[in-house]
């Protein structure tokens, strides 16, 4: 596992395993919402009414709809701040 993925993989896996709704902001400002179905080194499968394959290089930010706890390889817990979620997919200007 590459050093850069030592936090990314456990974080995404916790979101997937707990079926936490997420908002994914792309570098072009598009906001996608759904649940992480699966992921690998290059893509995330995001499921809502349809499944979308989102390339990681296009992602700016992943925001969970509620706080989560996960452990990375150094056993430090991290909690994400809860955010309000909306059902509408929108472009952030």
UniProtKB/Swiss-Prot annotation:
Cellular compartments per GO CC: cytosol
Biased composition (Low complexity): 70-81
Pfam families with a match to the protein in the record: Hfq
PROSITE patterns, alphabetized: SM
Biological process per Gene Ontology, one example term: regulation of RNA stability
GO molecular function: RNA binding
InterPro entries found in the cross-reference section: Hfq (IPR005001), LSM_dom_sf (IPR010920), Sm (IPR047575)
Keywords assigned by UniProt, alphabetized: RNA-binding, Stress response
Region (Disordered): 70-93
Domain annotation Sm: ranges: 9-68
Family to which the UniProt record says this protein belongs: Belongs to the Hfq family.
Assembly and binders: Homohexamer.
NCBIfam families xref list: Hfq, PRK00395.1
Role: RNA chaperone that binds small regulatory RNA (sRNAs) and mRNAs to facilitate mRNA translational regulation in response to envelope stress, environmental stress and changes in metabolite concentrations. Also binds with high specificity to tRNAs.
Protein name from the UniProt record: RNA-binding protein Hfq
Species: Glaesserella parasuis serovar 5 (strain SH0165)
